[in-house]
């Protein structure tokens, strides 16, 4: 744990939390900070665009016989953030090949548990080993390297940004059964927005925040 710095002076996790009085001010300030971070990304990554993505599945691990069979789960939909363009794109299952092509065209693909999960789901359509071939920054891998254990995206964004997920994978699977792909898209896009903001915060500040029994702690990152 020597790489961790006790956050005695950390601000409360309300960076993105909108109060009635200061919501607009905080939002404008954060947009300005993100714009600065994006300029830095553009300057440093000349070899191709940066994309962030997340996949929601049609079937659960129980449906397909275990997490080791994620390639059978199928794509309900995926959301991609084209970072430098500030644009989001949604891919339904029939566009799985286009999703793969979009990721292949990127200079950097950012995800959360993407190496083990999202890439495996996508490989069910193409047979390709994306964890080996794509330039990837998996933020979960970074946390495991720093902490020696896994930590959820929801925990990281709540502690670092003051904003969390709006649903979870089980709820998404229920929406699949109900045919509510509009709600799945809203949920998945929110996850990608959180991923983007966490990534940009880490680039700009050089750390993210977790909560331990001893208090809130800064975890250095160098992405």
Residue spans for each PLM region:
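DEDD superfamily 3′-5′ metal-dependent exonuclease/proofreading module
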Residues: 1-223
């Amino acid at each position: 744990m020597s790489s961790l710095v006790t956050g005695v002076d950390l601000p409360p996790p309300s960076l993105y939390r909108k109060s009635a009085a200061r919501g607009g001010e905080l939002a404008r300030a954060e947009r300005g900070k993100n714009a600065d971070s994006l300029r830095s990304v553009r300057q440093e990554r000349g070899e191709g665009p940066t994309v962030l993505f997340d996949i929601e599945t049609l079937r659960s691990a129980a449906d397909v016989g275990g997490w080791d069979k994620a390639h059978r789960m199928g794509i309900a939909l995926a959301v991609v953030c084209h970072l430098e363009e500030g644009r989001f794109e949604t891919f339904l299952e029939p566009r799985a090949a286009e999703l793969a092509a979009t990721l292949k065209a990127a200079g950097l693909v950012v995800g959360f548990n993407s190496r083990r999960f999202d890439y495996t789901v996508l490989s069910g359509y193409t047979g390709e080993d994306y964890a080996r071939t794509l330039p990837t920054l998996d933020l979960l891998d970074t946390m495991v390297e720093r902490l020696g254990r896994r930590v959820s995206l929801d925990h990281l964004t709540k502690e670092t940004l003051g904003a969390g997920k709006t649903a979870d994978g089980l709820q998404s699977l229920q929406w699949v059964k109900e045919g509510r792909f509009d709600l799945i898209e809203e949920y998945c896009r929110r996850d990608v927005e959180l991923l983007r903001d966490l990534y940009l915060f880490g680039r700009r500040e050089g750390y993210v925040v977790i909560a331990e029994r001893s208090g809130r702690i800064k975890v250095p990152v160098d992405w």
